[in-house]
Structures are given as structure tokens and as C-alpha cells.
């Protein structure tokens, strides 16, 4: 095994870890954001479901693995050079890792495509730009808008169904103690100061005290959660929505594992380190990528989790369920068709849709995230150019 091949394997391992750190929480962000679970509970659920989806990539991900191997995008003589795939993996991993440290949810798919373009431009031969647009860029552009539109539509439908069934939404009133500084009037007292002939009398008419009082708050305190009041098919509506919300979050984790594992394994296939026809080596590749992705999520997802759960929009569990349903549907269906959509664009786009529908979108943060999306591909491309020149 050459030094370049060792570097390639290390870069793919780093990309797997960075992908988990940035992407694993995207399915369970709604659980965390609605206080349905704690951060720890959410990240473990994300790990379990992502691992399950990653292992299914062995059975269902052949189309995506082939698409992201680079075959057809660049010539076979380029793919035969391990420097090419190593540069792609280094660029994608660096881009995603930097975004994770800054707390921005970005697209690993964008980063990989940027790496393929940058390294492809420097390598001998030509990049098939028509295939690049059809296979990669078009799905990436459509996905966030599709997620927003579907979320708005489903939110409206589900809300009308809820009202038709007589299920109301309750917001609690928080009542708690709070100490206040108050001025207390007291009887006039004559206070002697000084000694002997210098003694004078001064009056004291009051003092300040801390006294407990009652404070009332309505709305978004941690102890106040919106709940659904009523029954659906004989089941408590709030309990049913919570269960469906939890399952939908798991479905996004599964879909993400299926999509992104196949994309990363595709780099190993492109470098001919493993093959689609050699199912034994392919299984090992899928398993290693899956484990490293899970570790990345467990160890380094906190900053992205705060952004996704608390900084994009306020939401309740019903809205979280809607966002997750849209995300998982888009990601799983596109994976089966071999379209490389971004789980990030789908999940965050769905959260944008929730914010627009409920009127609680935080536009300053949304603008920052969109800007991070726009620069992901060119940054990865530039890093791939530099990495390819250094390695080769």
C-alpha cells in the first residue's frame, strides 16, 4: 500500500467522522428543539437510526455509490490515480469539519461535489459538466425548495385535520416565585450618633428588603410546552403525536445514514479500494464508514445541535413531526432513485418551512445558514485544488 493510498483511507475516515458530527443530529433536532427529549437521548437515538440506515446502504445504496464514485464525471485514468480521490476526501472533510466547529449545518454532499469538481479540474482530462449538472447540482438546487413547499402544504393539511377532529392546542401558564426589592416604611426613630457633647439625633424612616412575590409568564419557558388536548382513534392526542414525532425523527436518521454512507463509500469504490461486485469488501467499507459516522455524531455534534434545535425557529412536536416526515420522504425516495440530494437541505429546508408557517422563523440565522450553503461547494473545490497539487 502506497503512502498516497494510506492518506486516501485516512481522509475518507476523517470525512466519515466529520459527516457524523455535522449531519447526525439533523433528524433528531426537532426532538431536542421541542424538549421532547434531552440532548443525550436525542443523539443516541440519532446514532442507532443512522447506523441502521448505513447498514441498509449495503443493500439499497448501489446507485448512489456508483454516482459518487466519480465514474462518468471524470475519465477512468483520473480515477486510477489515488491522488484524485484523496484530494476530494481531504477537501470535503476539511470543509465539513470547519462548518461543524462554527456550528453551521452544511451539506456533505455539496462538499464532496465541490471536491470532485476542484480535483477534476486539476487532473488530466475533462470534467463532464453536463453530467455534473444533471446528477448532482439539479437535485441539490431543487431539494430545499421542495422541502419548504411540502412542509407548508402538509402543515396546512395537518392543522385542518386537527381542528376537524376537535384536537386543540394548549399553552400553559408558568407560575413561579421571584424575589423583589421593595422599600419598607417604618415608624420614625431617633438614632443617636456620636458621643458626649457631639451627640446628635437623626431620624430613620425606612429601609429596603427582599420579599418573595409571584411571577406569571406565558409562552416559551423551558417548563412550558405546548400540548395537544383531545383524542385520536381513542388515544390521547398529545401522547400519539409524541410517539409519531419520535418515529419520524428516527426515519430521518435512517434516511441520512442510507444516503451519506453510500456517498462516502462511493469514494472508496472510485479509488478501486473496494468494488460493487466484491460484496465482502463492500460490507466492510460500509461498516467502517457507519461506525466512524456514529462516533462523529456522539462526540462532536453539540454546536450544530444548538443551531438546529434552537436558533432557526420555535416549534412544537406536531410541527417537528411534519418537518421530519417531509425530510425522510424526500431523502429515502431520492436515495432509491440514485439522486444525490442533501439531507441537510431537506431537513433544514423543512425547518425553514415550519418557521414560515408558524411565523417564528429567525431570519438572521437562516440567512447565515444559506450563506454557508452557498460557499460550501466553492470552498471545497478550492481546497481540492490545493490538496491535489500538494499530493501529486
Regions picked out by a protein language model, each given a short descriptive name:
Residues 35-48, 135, 278-283, 317-322, ...:
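Membrane-interface alpha-helices at helix entry/exit sites of multi-pass transporters
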Residues 1-6, 74-80, 122-135, 270-284, ...:
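Helix-coil boundary and interhelical linker segments in multi-pass alpha-helical membrane proteins
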Residues 21-28, 36, 102-114, 259-267, ...:
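Short, non-helical or kinked segments that cap or interrupt transmembrane helices
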Residues 248-323:
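Transmembrane helical segments that form the transport core of multi-pass membrane transport proteins
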Residues 8-15, 45-53, 57, 61, ...:
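Alpha-helical transmembrane segments in multi-pass membrane proteins
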Residues 30-39, 113-127, 267-278, 348-360:
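Interfacial segments of multi-pass membrane proteins
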Amino acid at each position: 500500500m502506497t503512502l498516497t493510498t494510506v492518506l486516501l483511507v485516512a481522509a475518507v475516515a476523517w470525512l466519515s467522522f466529520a459527516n457524523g458530527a455535522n449531519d447526525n443530529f439533523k433528524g433528531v433536532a426537532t426532538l431536542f428543539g421541542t424538549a421532547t427529549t434531552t440532548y443525550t437521548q436525542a443523539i443516541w437515538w440519532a446514532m442507532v437510526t443512522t447506523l441502521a440506515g448505513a447498514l441498509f446502504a449495503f443493500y439499497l445504496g448501489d446507485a448512489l455509490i456508483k454516482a459518487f464514485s466519480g465514474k462518468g464525471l471524470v475519465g477512468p485514468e483520473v480515477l486510477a490515480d489515488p491522488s484524485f480521490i484523496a484530494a476530494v476526501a481531504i477537501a470535503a472533510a476539511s470543509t465539513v469539519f470547519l462548518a461543524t466547529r462554527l456550528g453551521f449545518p452544511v451539506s456533505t454532499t455539496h462538499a464532496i461535489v465541490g471536491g470532485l469538481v476542484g480535483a477534476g479540474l486539476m487532473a488530466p482530462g475533462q470534467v463532464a459538466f453536463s453530467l455534473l449538472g444533471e446528477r448532482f447540482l439539479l437535485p441539490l438546487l431543487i431539494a430545499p425548495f421542495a422541502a419548504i413547499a411540502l412542509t407548508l402544504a402538509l402543515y396546512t393539511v395537518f392543522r385542518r385535520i386537527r381542528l376537524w377532529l376537535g384536537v386543540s392546542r394548549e399553552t400553559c401558564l408558568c407560575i413561579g416565585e421571584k424575589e423583589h426589592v421593595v422599600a419598607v416604611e417604618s415608624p420614625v426613630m431617633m438614632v443617636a450618633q456620636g458621643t458626649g457633647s457631639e451627640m446628635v439625633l437623626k431620624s430613620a424612616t425606612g429601609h429596603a428588603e427582599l420579599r418573595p412575590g409571584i411571577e406569571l409568564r406565558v409562552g416559551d419557558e423551558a417548563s412550558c410546552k405546548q400540548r395537544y388536548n383531545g383524542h385520536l382513534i381513542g388515544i390521547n392526542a398529545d401522547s400519539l403525536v409524541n410517539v409519531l414525532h419520535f418515529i419520524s425523527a428516527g426515519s430521518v436518521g435512517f434516511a441520512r445514514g442510507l444516503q451519506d454512507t453510500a456517498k462516502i463509500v462511493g469514494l472508496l469504490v472510485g479509488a478501486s479500494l473496494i468494488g460493487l461486485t466484491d460484496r465482502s469488501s463492500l460490507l466492510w467499507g460500509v461498516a467502517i464508514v457507519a461506525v466512524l459516522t456514529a462516533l462523529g455524531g456522539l462526540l462532536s455534534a453539540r454546536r450544530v445541535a444548538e443551531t438546529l434545535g434552537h436558533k432557526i425557529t420555535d416549534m412544537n412536536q406536531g410541527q417537528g413531526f411534519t418537518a421530519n416526515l417531509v425530510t425522510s420522504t424526500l431523502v429515502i425516495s431520492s436515495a432509491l432513485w440514485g439522486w444525490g440530494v442533501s439531507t441537510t437541505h431537506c431537513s433544514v429546508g423543512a425547518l425553514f418551512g415550519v418557521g414560515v408557517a408558524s411565523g417564528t422563523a429567525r431570519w438572521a440565522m437562516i440567512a447565515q445558514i444559506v450563506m454557508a450553503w452557498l460557499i460550501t461547494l466553492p470552498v471545497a473545490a478550492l481546497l481540492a485544488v490545493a490538496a491535489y497539487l500538494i499530493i501529486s
